[in-house]
């Protein structure tokens, strides 16, 4: 894995107007929406991934332990921003987003670069047996002190990318664990409302 550049920024540090941001009202789903110029500055209801080919249209996803996944097809000039939590990952939202980029914009998965931002790591993501079963045994990386399964959710996202045809060399995964790092928002650790914002925008 490769470290993804992760920084705190305020509005004055953004290279686009905050009023242009397109976000989504996340519902832990596999619902994906295509964003066009008419949606600039809006919140898209009831979805967990956004795709656009419009320039200078920033897409925002909010997370606090879930995996933020950004996709960039340099050839077709298409980007996507994905909130891949437990439910979304189980429902294959990352794979489905790649498929929508291919079907709606003509993207070739081999041209897509993917990056995952800070998220909860396998040492910290404790789930029950039923949840672990839904993920599959290969993503169980150990057991907690209470003998509950520990899941590597980023590896599940990575497999979806690879199975879609995205090259392993084009997948970058942040090594920052939100649960282990107090400077990053973590629902598991703090049960707080604070969120990490992940942006992607075509210049």
List the predicted regions and their residue ranges.
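Active-site microenvironment for binding and transforming phosphate-containing groups
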Residues: 1-203
